[in-house]
Structures are given as C-alpha cells and as structure tokens.
Amino acid sequence: MHAWPAPEVPELPGHGSAVRLHDTAAQGLVPTPAAAPGEAARIYVCGITPYDATHMGHANTYLTFDLIQRAWLDAGHPVSYVQNVTDVDDPLLERAAATGRDWEALAESETALFREDMTALRILPPQHYVGAVESIPLVVDLVVKLLERGAAYDVDGDVYFSVHADPAFGAVAHLDAPEMLTTFGERGGDPGRPGKKDPLDCLLWQAEREGEPSWEPGEQARAAGLKPGRPGWHIECAAIALEHLGMGIDLQGGGSDLAFPHHEMGASEAQVVTGQRPYAHSYVHSGMVGLDGEKMSKSKGNLVLVSKLRHAGVDPMAIRLALLAHHYRTDWEWTDADLVSAVARLARWRAAVSRPDGVPADDVLDAVRARIADDLDAPGALAVIDAWVARQEAADGDDTAAASAQRNTAAPGQISRITDALLGVAL
C-alpha cells in the first residue's frame, strides 16, 4: 500500500534539541527520541479504519506526530515512520453492509480520501504505509508463536491472547482492574465471553463467520490449531511494527483512546512473542477533539470533515493552524471560532512575510525550537510567530532612519522557513 507525497521540509541553521514529551507509561515528561544522536528515530502511529472520511480528531492526531517528526529531523535524526490501515474490521464491514457497498471498495475509497487530506494538510507520510489485509501472513506467524509459547489459547475456534503471559501488562495505561474491564468493554473488547481464562484476554484470530471475509492461515498454522478467519485488531499493529521497526522503538503514538486496550495489548503481545522488552521507549497520546459536548467519532456521526472544509474553499493551512492553536494533549471542542481565528492568523502571517524586508528575526528560530521541545508546545510556538508579525506590522510605514536601519531583507524568508520546517505551515 502506498502513502502520500512528502512535502519538502526546509533545512534550518543549526540543530534543535531533544524533545521532551509526555510519556503515558512513564506518567511524565521524557526526552525523545531514545536513539543516539544522528541515529534513526523509529515511530509507529496507529492509522485509520477506513469506513468514513477524515475528521478533525484524526487530523489532530496525525498533526501531532507530524510535528514530532519535524522536531526530530531538526535535531538531526532521520526518521523511520510506520503507519497502518485497519482495512478489515467490524466497523468497516458493518458500514459496508449498511450502505450496500463492497467492503474492499469502501476501504479503498476512504483510504484514498485520507491520503488527499493528509497531502493537503502537509502531513509527513510514513515510509511504510501498511494495510492489515496485506499483513495477515505476519499476524498468522505471531499467533502461531504465541500458541507455541502457551500465551494464547482456543475458544470455540477463535484464538485469544492471555494477558497473564506478560508480567508487565498494565504498565502502559496504568488503569486499575475495574477501569481496565470497563474500558475494554467500551473499546471493542468482549470481557463477558464464556470460555475465556480472563475477561481481559483479547482476540488474536477470529474464526470464519458466515458472510464475512476470511483467509486461509496455511498448513503450519492449521497444524497449530488456526482455522480460516481474520486477525484481531491489536495483533495487527504488533505484527506490522515488529516487521518494519523491530523491538525497542522510540515512540508508539495515537489518540488517547488507544492507550487502553490497544497500545497496552499490542505492547504485551510483542513483548511476549519476542521475549524482549520494552516494545516502545515512550507512548505518546494526543487528546480528543469534541463537537457539541461529545468526542468527535465516526460511530456518533458528530464530525467536522477535513475534505468538506477543503471543498468549501477553506485553506488547509488555516485548518492546520486551527489545530496547532490547541496543545496536543488537551481535550477540546471544535468551534467555528477556531477556524475564523486561524484564517485571520494565516492572513496576517502571509501579509507580514510578503513584504520586501522585515524587523529582525534572529531570535525567532531558537524561541520556536524551545517551545516545540517543551512537550510540543505548538500554541507557544504560534505566539512566537505572532509576536514577530506584530513587530512587523508596527514597523510598517515607519520610515525613520533608525527603523530602516533595523529592517533586513532576510527576515521574511527566515520566518517562512521556520513556520514551514517546524510547524508545517506553508506561507
């Protein structure tokens, strides 16, 4: 599966510093990446289930990890980035059945729209953009290994992962037992299924169901007990990450609603199947974007779609600025006022850099780098650019000798390159 075109990232003078990010597992700020200076930083971000268009919650998540990549690149780290597409799953099959569409055609069309939205928003693409369907052989291999290790078992033809196989289970999200049970049930788990050893045990391989797609696991897997079927959700990401990045990745990312059970389960499965730990050095989660008092989600239908705004003529850079105005870890409500403010900010910035010269900008790069390095403080970085723009506006029309002596022709270009390289905003 192919990703989307990569926007050019300008090189800036010098290098940024390590980025301190809030690690869900460590429950505090940690320096990232864990990779040594100059070495590649490895990041895995969970992708979409393609049964509907990209909404602001999606955009907020992928913008978060775009900023992290830009900061790592600025600090001198090449980035190895993998993202999946859950192109076979219950919500996709249910939407296809409800609309009378072929599930594969639905997944393909929504994935194509997602690529268009990411391109418009200038989100850096993954080097490996991998579908669940194409990864089924990888999943089968892991499920067989987990069975052989006694970490998985059969329930009426389905195969489940035993969470007790990983003594560190729970170390990612830090939920207590009642919270785990409730959250597991709310987010796709089946805690009440009879025959399971523990209510939290999660599905690795679902045996064939009538009217649903299934795959033949192969002779070796058949001998291990697998029947024709399809993969569970968590093991897909574990398999893809291990194949393309290996263990000990620098960062596992996604929305905060993925910390448990998805990232918890995936980490445990990877650690048990390899016998190594940690799966990831840090777990970084973006906040939820709401609308009308509820989390924006496909299932609820309370969506503000990137594509709809684009087709209405909204500049994608204004959408990007509207998202950057909120700290990545906060939960917040999308409002029309966010977009109005972002459109005005974009116009001011573009007007300021369109002038033939400008007020000094030598301190702006260090200030923006400092804000981004401090737990990805994008609102603070925007404020730095705003301050330069305000100085530029105040100097407009000041033709005194002192003012003219301070202006230089390089400043507008400096600001444009900074906003492009570190914030991804093309002026």
Curated annotation (Swiss-Prot):
Residues the entry annotates as binding L-cysteinyl-5'-AMP: 46-49, 61, 84-86, 233, 255-257, 289
One Pfam family matching this protein: tRNA-synt_1e
Enzyme superclass (EC): ligase
Protein name (Swiss-Prot/TrEMBL): L-cysteine:1D-myo-inositol 2-amino-2-deoxy-alpha-D-glucopyranoside ligase
Keywords, sorted A to Z: ATP-binding, Ligase, Metal-binding, Nucleotide-binding, Zinc
Family the UniProt entry places it in: Belongs to the class-I aminoacyl-tRNA synthetase family. MshC subfamily.
GO cellular component: cytosol
Organism: Catenulispora acidiphila (strain DSM 44928 / JCM 14897 / NBRC 102108 / NRRL B-24433 / ID139908)
GO BP annotations listed: cysteinyl-tRNA aminoacylation; mycothiol biosynthetic process
Quaternary structure and interacting proteins, as annotated: Monomer.
Textual note on the cofactor: Binds 1 zinc ion per subunit.
